[in-house]
Amino acid sequence: MDTTSRTRPDDRRGRPTAAAFFDVEGTLLAAPDLAAATGPLGRLWHPPVLAALHGHAALGHLVVLVARAGATELAPITRDLAPDAVLCSRPEAPMIGQGKGYAARALLRECGILAARCYAYADEAADLPLLAEVGHPVVVGDDPVLLRHARRGNWRRLPAPSAERK
């Protein structure tokens, strides 16, 4: 799949048995659009989501960034975080909506990881297909559509980025 890129060598012993998918815009970063983000990345990280990413990495989970942005725009983020994989937009295939769910499913199949053992973190209704692909969805913020799903499915929640970080 050419929307996936590996960003670090697999130096773990054995294969990962779980994955954690992190929507970038508005979830991992407080900025809803990377093109409009200015200043150092450190100010833009959403601390609870960044902590979750580091926690999953420490557990040996496959860490995957999922973004509407393209690979060039994501380069500073991938350099800082060194995820295992990146699912991002290409000119002919934007990474939005159902595309995020399809890409996540394809990556899990390729890696032989059961979706029931996986996590996804996202902030808006358009990310519902990504959240629906995993056994442990986490809603970030207060999108009303996602909150309804979270209440029905007993999904975890994390707070939205604070206004002064945006």
Residues covered by each model-derived region:
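C-terminal cap/substrate-recognition subdomain and adjoining C-terminal extension
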Residues: D2-F22, L41-K166
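Basic, amphipathic juxtamembrane/active-site segments
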Residues: P32-T38
